[in-house]
UniProtKB/Swiss-Prot annotation:
It comes from Macrococcus caseolyticus (strain JCSC5402) (Macrococcoides caseolyticum). One of its GO terms (biological process) is GTP biosynthetic process. Major role in the synthesis of nucleoside triphosphates other than ATP. The ATP gamma phosphate is transferred to the NDP beta phosphate via a ping-pong mechanism, using a phosphorylated active-site intermediate. The lineage of its organism: Bacteria, Bacillati, Bacillota, Bacilli, Bacillales. Belongs to the NDK family. This is Nucleoside diphosphate kinase. GO terms for cellular component: cytoplasm. Its EC number is 2.7.4.6. ATP binds at residues 9, 57, 85, 91, 102, 112. The active site is at 115 (pros-phosphohistidine intermediate). Its cofactor is Mg(2+). Transmembrane segments: none annotated.
Amino acid sequence: MEKTFLMIKPDGVGRGLIGEIVKRIENKGIKVVGAKLMTVSEDLAKTHYGEHSEKPFFGELVEFITSGPVFAMVLEGDNVVEIGRTLVGKTNPAESAPGTIRGDFGMTVGKNIIHGSDSVASADKEIALWFKEEEILSYDLVTSAWVY
């Protein structure tokens, strides 16, 4: 079964949105198989956002993601990367549809509540970066028969 990585950023955690966001994920039928509330080290932030290291906003991005706790998650389900991206919405909250996490809660491109892997390859890389293998669980949902 496919896995993806989602992270509620410091603005989402600070606004008390963890429960609402997890509720939306679970209501969709997606299984949370790993989760942790944590502070992000500068090294982890720089590695995670390494593809943006030459961009002018890189320093602000690292500063923001290390400014408060994040809620990191591993999600599992059929086609979960694409479904996760749909739930998250577009990077710019102003362009995100109502009903998406960013459309409903995001304020700016820089403070857009949540990160979601954009491909299966990115998900695999991000999960390995943020989670140890033993932090990812395997279990059955009683609703699996109706969802899958």
